[in-house]
């Protein structure tokens, strides 16, 4: 416990809250280049092959980002736009790739929640 004299000299500091999306450096989204596109399996009760990409962001940090939706056209060297948002059953995946932006195509034949998956309105 500090003495009163130590408190007069230094004072107390507020703890700063840890940011969940540190690699974005305060931006809502960040551009990046895919360095590896692969599938991985989720945590215990679930079973699937989740599509994930390793992305080097313009901030210089390399992160794992989830590719949402059915089917994708991403490969190594694809330019992608990354947003925050974790995938609960994939440990270490704290970012998502935005569909329909830059090199990422939207999901084909998507009828509902189209704006989330970059799908155009069907005529």
UniProtKB/Swiss-Prot annotation:
Designated name of the protein: Small ribosomal subunit protein uS12
Subunit architecture: Part of the 30S ribosomal subunit. Contacts proteins S8 and S17. May interact with IF1 in the 30S initiation complex.
GO MF term set: rRNA binding; structural constituent of ribosome; tRNA binding
Gene3D superfamilies the UniProt entry points to: Nucleic acid-binding proteins
Gene: rpsL
Protein keywords: Ribonucleoprotein, Ribosomal protein, RNA-binding, rRNA-binding, tRNA-binding
One Gene Ontology term, aspect cellular component: small ribosomal subunit
Function: With S4 and S5 plays an important role in translational accuracy.
HAMAP family hit by this protein: Ribosomal_uS12_B
PROSITE patterns in the record: RIBOSOMAL_S12
Organism: Corynebacterium diphtheriae (strain ATCC 700971 / NCTC 13129 / Biotype gravis)
Source taxon at top rank: Bacteria
């Amino acid at each position: 416990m500090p003495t009163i004299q130590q408190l007069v000299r230094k004072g107390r500091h507020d703890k700063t809250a840890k940011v969940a999306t540190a690699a974005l450096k305060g931006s809502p989204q960040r551009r990046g280049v895919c360095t590896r596109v692969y599938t991985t399996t989720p945590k215990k009760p679930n079973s699937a092959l989740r599509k994930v990409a390793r992305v080097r962001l313009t901030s210089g940090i390399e992160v794992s980002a989830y590719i949402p939706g059915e089917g994708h056209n991403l490969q190594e060297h694809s330019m992608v736009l990354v947003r925050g948002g974790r995938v609960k059953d994939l440990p270490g995946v704290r970012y998502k790739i935005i569909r329909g932006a830059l090199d990422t195509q939207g999901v084909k034949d998507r009828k509902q929640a189209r704006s989330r998956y970059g799908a155009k309105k069907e005529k």
